[in-house]
């Protein structure tokens, strides 16, 4: 079990806050936050609940998703696939099926991004991508990260944090909105 810094508290407050993450996972969680917001925009856009509506809005959202993939998900997936998942597979008994499912979702997302350039079926594709991205992120946040925090000791966690930062950069990924690409 990890020892968290003294200032780190998972004690519930009066507000409903997301779970605190071990510092080594914060950059991945930061990407997840932006990914969840994008997933919601994708689903709303596909359902005609965001302006601009119609084909123009769908093209805008497709570009946003492709930009997010390029700026965030490529490095994010690499960090998970090269650093986090191999450690989890070795250290957490019974995690193989869950990790294989997540790797399969990475591949689904990779294969779907080039389809965003196609004109037909864009609403369904954007909705499906938003849905898949949300389910994927929630599974990592609710299942993988708690397993990491329960099974990985402090020295391993620190080492993982350093390795993740090498791939993701000091601040983790950036929001597409942060780059003015929305």
Over which residues does each language-model region extend?
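Small-residue-biased structural context
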Residues: 2-182
